[in-house]
């Protein structure tokens, strides 16, 4: 399971730019406090980095 990463939406994207909303949607995060398990690759890491103020990585 080392090549999977769990991401949780901890802040709302209401009032955020449309690009950040689309990034959250592409990560599968549509509601607050939901956790998604995603593959750990460079593309996903880059998306998480763009919205790092809205999400957290859960261990």
From Swiss-Prot:
**Which GO BP annotation is one of this protein's?**
translation
Q: Which UniProt keywords apply?
A: Ribonucleoprotein, Ribosomal protein
Pfam families the record matches: Ribosomal_L30 (PF00327)
Say if the entry is tagged with keyword Kinase: no
Question: Which GO cellular component terms, listed alphabetically, does the Swiss-Prot or TrEMBL entry include?
Answer: cytosolic large ribosomal subunit
**In the record, what terms sit under GO molecular function?**
structural constituent of ribosome
Superkingdom of the organism of origin: Bacteria
Q: Do the record's keywords include Ribonucleoprotein? A: yes
Classification via InterPro entries: Ribo_uL30_ferredoxin-like_sf (IPR036919), Ribosomal_uL30_bac-type (IPR005996), Ribosomal_uL30_ferredoxin-like (IPR016082)
Return the NCBIfam families for the record: rpmD_bact (TIGR01308)
Q: Which family does it belong to?
A: Belongs to the universal ribosomal protein uL30 family.
Oligomeric form and interacting partners: Part of the 50S ribosomal subunit.
Please identify the protein, giving its name as recorded: Large ribosomal subunit protein uL30
Native species: Magnetococcus marinus (strain ATCC BAA-1437 / JCM 17883 / MC-1)
Q: What is the lineage of its organism?
A: Bacteria, Pseudomonadati, Pseudomonadota, Alphaproteobacteria, Magnetococcales
